[in-house]
Amino acid sequence: MTQEEMISAIESMTVLELSELVKALEEKFGVSAAAPVAVAAAVGGGEAVVEEAKTEFDVILASAGDKKIHVIKAVREMTGLGLKEAKDLVEGAPKAVKEAVSKDEADKLKAKLEEAGAVVEIK
């Protein structure tokens, strides 16, 4: 069977038949069809592809800046921590303020902390 004949046969298959073919090939050769697609996307898109796929983000306080008291107040408001815990978190920067939050929430927290004078990263 030539390549053209194989391509022609694949073109005439239904989606269900193609899905079954892929599963059979994965089992036969011990591979995953998803891996090559992910590698190709990462090569082409680089950092943007990783960002789009990520759904949970960590808000990291990199530095309190020169308005430490305002930053402590903002951290207490966001996290519900007591004064001592919030102060320890701010003084121990870089530290995670919140982990595994949505992109929208991470952006809001970052804006609020930066408004208070902090340097913030989202990872």
From Swiss-Prot:
Gene3D superfamilies with a match to the protein in the record: 3.30.1390.10, Single helix bin
Keywords assigned: Ribonucleoprotein, Ribosomal protein
Gene Ontology biological process: translation
One cellular component (GO) term of this entry: cytosolic large ribosomal subunit
GO molecular function: mRNA binding; structural constituent of ribosome
Pfam families recorded: Ribosomal_L12, Ribosomal_L12_N
Subunit-level organization: Homodimer. Part of the ribosomal stalk of the 50S ribosomal subunit. Forms a multimeric L10(L12)X complex, where L10 forms an elongated spine to which 2 to 4 L12 dimers bind in a sequential fashion. Binds GTP-bound translation factors.
Family the UniProt entry places it in: Belongs to the bacterial ribosomal protein bL12 family.
PANTHER family: 39S RIBOSOMAL PROTEIN L12, LARGE RIBOSOMAL SUBUNIT PROTEIN BL12M
Stated role: Forms part of the ribosomal stalk which helps the ribosome interact with GTP-bound translation factors. Is thus essential for accurate translation.
Stated name of the protein: Large ribosomal subunit protein bL12
Gene designation per UniProt: rplL
